[in-house]
Amino acid sequence: MAGLLSTFDTFSSRRSESINKSGGGAIIPGQRSTVSVFILGPSVTDDADKLLIATTFLAHSLDTDKQHSQRGGFLVSLLAMAYSSPELYLTTNGVNADVKYVIYNIERDPKRTKTDGFIVKTRDMEYERTTEWLFGPMINKNPLFQGQRENADLEALLQTYGYPACLGAIIVQVWIVLVKAITSSSGLRKGFFNRLEAFRQDGTVKSALVFTGDTVEGIGAVMRSQQSLVSLMVETLVTMNTSRSDLTTLEKNIQIVGNYIRESGLASFMNTIKYGVETKMAALTLSNLRPDINKLRSLVDIYLSKGARAPFTCILRDPVHGEFAPGNYPALWSYAMGVAVVQNKAMQQYVTGRTYLDMEMFLLGQAVAKDADSKISSALEEELGVTDTAKERLRHHLTNLSGGDGAYHKPTGGGAIEVAIDHTDITFGAEDTADRDNKNWTNNSNERWMNHSINNHTITISGAEELEEETNDEDITDIENKIARRLADRKQRLSQANNRQDASSDADHENDDDATAAAGIGGI
């Protein structure tokens, strides 16, 4: 039997291995599109010209009349301006199964009076039509930078801070967009400006060069549609040699942004390991957590097999990235989130009210995290030489710290979960009131939250979803009206009862209505 169980324990990891392994056979290349990339030739030496070209690339990348592949090519051209050898940058990081980059040079021609004196060319020929298309008149539907709304002088910024700082401010913001563009498009604009604040405070990005919200959304849309652009940026982070002592300021800033990009979309997976497994509490021995633990173990093996690109599994849309979703290990994730909201206050803002949340495991995680004995690591006791007296004092302090907070945290961010908690315990029948009293229900919302079973029926996600569908504004209005009528009737009956001198306390209790209890519970 032991051998049979061990076979099942390793099944998840072996199954994942078999899915990821190649079945052999010939490798058949897919279709690749051609993307034009423009780089600065040696004749373009003036800093004002360079900044003009950079803003031209940015403007073209936001032009909704162009194909997304063309817009992506302009963003690649902009990113390549950070390096002294754009060709080497693209050769090193731009190898991609989806696209083939065709490089064109932009040169300065003193004889030309149109197109700002620029010409697009290769070694063999010049491209007049491409030059006019690139440097011809453009209608910017929206300003690129917030400073343009205030008529800020970019040339003055260039003279004050220099070309590298101005170019770096633009490129860093493109990198910041990637942090949320793929994994959280709905929160892109807010996330962008939150991440940008640190770079504004240290002077990396000047206020006049801050992207507008429309610019951020436009770049994000291109990134979501052009996986080749995202792959290029990820390869830049993977191949960037962090041990170099001669990193430019822009490269250092790219690495800082890269720390936010790494493991983007894997927060649930990492938090489950951090709060669910690494805390090493006794709850991990529960049998209903074992399947999820085995699943998590197989995911760890998959993650490690990806090597340097493992942190970018989601942002690269790796075929296995869906396996890391918490819905594949819901019980363990729910338990870990319960531990997290107790141990880390910042995690109380994390969206836990999801359809696959296991309420029992979520509450169990909070319970064990609040328990003083569970907070003491037996593995470290021997290593640190902690005495029994010291352990008792530590338990005493932990109990005092957590003793005043007996409330359990509710899930956040999930409409179905919130509705289930807020409305399922609204009852108006006398039999329901008696049933509630028999089960020692209380009007205190915190105590009621700890005892989350109602009528011997634990709140389920499916029931919550049905309740959310059935509950509307008219239902809530009806409930409010019923409560108002009940309160009025109760007030009248209490007034009549006070006039009866021979009324007993038991009779008063029988006349007591449950509307007040329902209102006190917080059902509305």
From Swiss-Prot:
The keyword RNA-binding applies. It is found in: Virion; Host cytoplasm. The keyword Ribonucleoprotein applies. Keywords: Capsid protein, Helical capsid protein, Host cytoplasm, Ribonucleoprotein, RNA-binding, Viral nucleoprotein, Virion. Residues 4-404 are annotated as: Ncore. Residues 490-524 are annotated as: Disordered. Pfam families: Paramyxo_ncap. Residues 440-461 are annotated as: Homomultimerization. InterPro entries: Paramyx_ncap. Residues 405-524 are annotated as: Ntail. Residues 462-471 are annotated as: Interaction with the phosphoprotein. RNA binds at K180, K190, R195, Y260, Y350, R354. It comes from the Viruses. One of its GO terms (molecular function) is RNA binding. Homomultimer; forms the nucleocapsid. Binds to the viral genomic RNA. N0 interacts with the phosphoprotein (via N-terminus); this interaction allows P to chaperon N0 to avoid N polymerization before encapsidation. Interacts as N-RNA template with the phosphoprotein (via C-terminus); this interaction positions the polymerase on the template. Belongs to the paramyxoviruses nucleocapsid family. Forms the helical nucleocapsid (NC) in a ratio of 1 N per 6 ribonucleotides, protecting the genome from nucleases. The encapsidated genomic RNA serves as template for transcription and replication; encapsidation by N is coupled to RNA synthesis. Forms the encapsidation complex with the phosphoprotein protein P. Before encapsidation, the newly synthesized free N protein, so-called N0, is chaperoned by P. Ncore is globular and carries regions required for self-assembly and RNA-binding. Ntail is an intrinsically disordered monomeric domain in the C-terminus. This is Nucleoprotein. It comes from Human parainfluenza 1 virus (strain C39). The gene is N.
